[in-house]
């Protein structure tokens, strides 16, 4: 336990899940939903010790009586009071540490507004009194976790998808692509197409069931048209799923129609390019001399890249777009669901990183704007 006295904390705040733990560990200790719930009704049972707000798993389990809010929308923090509750929950309830004793590494979405980084810095030093902190870009951490400093990361989570080209450890902001299409939208789309099949999923509780179906049964087809033909002519692609009440439902072409939306956003009425095209467009916005390195280092990260078949499909689609002689490699690490956190854990435990922290005295002298000078 002596070790943990000065260990840095790493907190990766995603739109869907918050991942928190100690630098140097190979996986986060705590993973919980980024939600804050408040009671919808006045408590009637006296002395029940009802709280005015619940965070994470507890909010999820009591969702029937709560109004749930996600403080992080599309990767960017929009509700600071709720965000403070999530950080408080991470430190005190999940990790059981006193933040004033640990340097803390936070993550941010690519192209996070400047005011947001300052606000994060301010809350860490003034509300939680951390001795030191740092803010790192999520996609850059994923790249570190894969053992690279140059490459293009496709980071797709619950709320947002980004393509981030990185050269020698620096993200190239002019070429970053953002797509507001991610896990939550795919869950919604799966709810919609299952409803068309005659199964009814409407409430937030049922939405969690659909998310589970999505995570267990969906996959990306290598050739969508062929797969649709196979599904129509045989039942080889059908799988059954048992609902919590014991009812069994059968799911067929929905298994690959759902994630196909990533490649064809028009499925949900979005006028946007698919993830293969945004990857290509992002590479084309980079300097001609580094494109070769980016094509050869396509790193997938985030929970929405966990579909079986996604790497092969990306390989096929990007090969079709790129020059014919180009070597294209898609890297899909098995732990990519948590690779942002893992990259943070690696970074915060490097000896060379220790002078990069923003310390409390530096903050007191310069104020929140110091984050732009020290974290880039």
Swiss-Prot record:
It is an enzyme of class 3 (hydrolase). The modification N-acetylcysteine is found at residue 2. Changing residue 336 to W: Found in a severe infantile gastrointestinal motility disorder; uncertain significance. In the intestine, abundantly expressed in smooth muscle cells of muscularis mucosa and muscularis propria. Also detected in intestinal vascular smooth muscle cells. It comes from the Eukaryota. The modification N-acetylglutamate is found at residue 3. GO terms for cellular component: actin cytoskeleton; blood microparticle; cell body; cell periphery; cytoplasm; cytosol; extracellular exosome; extracellular space. The modification Methionine (R)-sulfoxide is found at residues 45, 48. Its EC number is 3.6.4.-. GO terms for biological process: mesenchyme migration; positive regulation of gene expression. Changing residue 63 to Q: In MMIHS5; interferes with proper polymerization into thin filaments. Keywords: Acetylation, ATP-binding, Cytoplasm, Cytoskeleton, Disease variant, Hydrolase, Isopeptide bond, Methylation, Muscle protein, Nucleotide-binding, Oxidation. There is a cross-link at residue 271 (Isoglutamyl lysine isopeptide (Glu-Lys) (interchain with K-51)). It catalyses: ATP + H2O = ADP + phosphate + H(+). The keyword Ligase does not apply. Changing residue 40 to H: In VSCM1 and MMIHS5. Changing residue 72 to L/M: Slightly decreased methylation by SETD3. Actins are highly conserved proteins that are involved in various types of cell motility and are ubiquitously expressed in all eukaryotic cells. PANTHER family: ACTIN. In vertebrates 3 main groups of actin isoforms, alpha, beta and gamma have been identified. The alpha actins are found in muscle tissues and are a major constituent of the contractile apparatus. The beta and gamma actins coexist in most cell types as components of the cytoskeleton and as mediators of internal cell motility. Belongs to the actin family. This is Actin, gamma-enteric smooth muscle.
């Amino acid at each position: 336990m002596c070790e943990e006295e000065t260990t840095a904390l790493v907190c990766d705040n995603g739109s869907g899940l918050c991942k928190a733990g100690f630098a140097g560990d190979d996986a986060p200790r705590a993973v919980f939903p980024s939600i804050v719930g408040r009671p919808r009704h006045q408590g009637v049972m006296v002395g029940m010790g009802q709280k005015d707000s619940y965070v994470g798993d507890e909010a999820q389990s009591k969702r029937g009586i709560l109004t749930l809010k996600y403080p992080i929308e599309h990767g960017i923090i929009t509700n600071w009071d709720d965000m403070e509750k999530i950080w408080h929950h991470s430190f005190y309830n999940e990790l059981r540490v006193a933040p004033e004793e640990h340097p803390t590494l936070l993550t941010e979405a690519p192209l996070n507004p400047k005011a947001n980084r300052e606000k994060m810095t301010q809350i860490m030093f003034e509300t939680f009194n951390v001795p030191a902190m740092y803010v790192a870009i999520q996609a850059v951490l994923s790249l570190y976790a894969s053992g690279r400093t140059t490459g293009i990361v496709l980071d797709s989570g619950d709320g947002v998808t980004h393509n981030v080209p990185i050269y020698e450890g620096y993200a190239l902001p002019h070429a970053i692509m953002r797509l507001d299409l991610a896990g939550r939208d795919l869950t919604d789309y799966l709810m919609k197409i299952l409803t068309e099949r005659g199964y009814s999923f409407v409430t937030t509780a049922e939405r969690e069931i659909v998310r589970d179906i999505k995570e267990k049964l969906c996959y990306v087809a290598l050739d969508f048209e062929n797969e649709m033909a196979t599904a129509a002519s045989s039942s080889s692609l059908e799988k059954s799923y048992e609902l919590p009440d014991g009812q069994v439902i059968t799911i067929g072409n929905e298994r690959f129609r759902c994630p196909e939306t990533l490649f064809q956003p028009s499925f949900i009425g979005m006028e946007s390019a698919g993830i293969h095209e945004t990857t290509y467009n992002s590479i084309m916005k980079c300097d001609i001399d580094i494109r070769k390195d980016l094509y050869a280092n396509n790193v997938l990260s985030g929970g929405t890249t966990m579909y079986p078949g996604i790497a092969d499909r990306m390989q096929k689609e990007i090969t079709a777009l790129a020059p014919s002689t180009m070597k294209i490699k898609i890297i899909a690490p098995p732990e990519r669901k948590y690779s942002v956190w893992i990259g943070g854990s690696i970074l915060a435990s490097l000896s060379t990183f220790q002078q990069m922290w923003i310390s409390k005295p530096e903050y007191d002298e310069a104020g929140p704007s110091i984050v732009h000078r020290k974290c880039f």
